[in-house]
Amino acid sequence: SVGLGSRKDDNFQQLSEGQKQLCLLARTFVLKRRLLLLDEPESALDFRLRYETMGLLRTYVAKNNAAALVTLHDPSLALNYCDTLLVLSDCGLLGELHPFSTPISKMEPLLSSIYGTISLTTLSTRRGEKRLIMIKEDDDC
């Protein structure tokens, strides 16, 4: 469930951009595909829904023995929900990361080469989940 039950009788055009995005994701789940190709599935969603949507996607992949190839521009989402990250630039492939098994000290140099000086740290949520947080260090402060 993507949380749109109360809008089930509404026309697609009546939904907000975020609700449309969730509706399209739900349609993808119903098709039970084993390979999902998703271009920024969280793009029209607010902060909370971005994380919930990526959690739904990760659960779908696990329960359906599926794989998802997802483009994301938010490194925090990628670091917390993707098993493998291919870090790209206009010049091509910069590197590959495995956030759940690679030590933070090995990920920071590659991410710093893209975003400038950053540091990674872990945070525990109220639900006891671990989150990897990327902090951009401002050289002007």
Predicted features along the sequence, with ranges:
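H-loop/switch region of ABC-family ATPase nucleotide-binding domains
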Residues: L72-H73
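Conserved ABC ATPase signature
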Residues: N11-L15
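Conserved beta-strand-loop-alpha-helix hinge in the C-terminal portion
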Residues: L88-T117
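Catalytic Walker B motif of ABC-type/P-loop ATPase nucleotide-binding domains
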Residues: L36-E40
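Helical segment within the ABC ATPase nucleotide-binding domain
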Residues: Y51-K63
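Conserved ABC ATPase "signature" region
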Residues: S1-R7
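Helix N-cap at the start of a conserved alpha-helix in ABC-type nucleotide-binding domains
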Residues: F47-L49
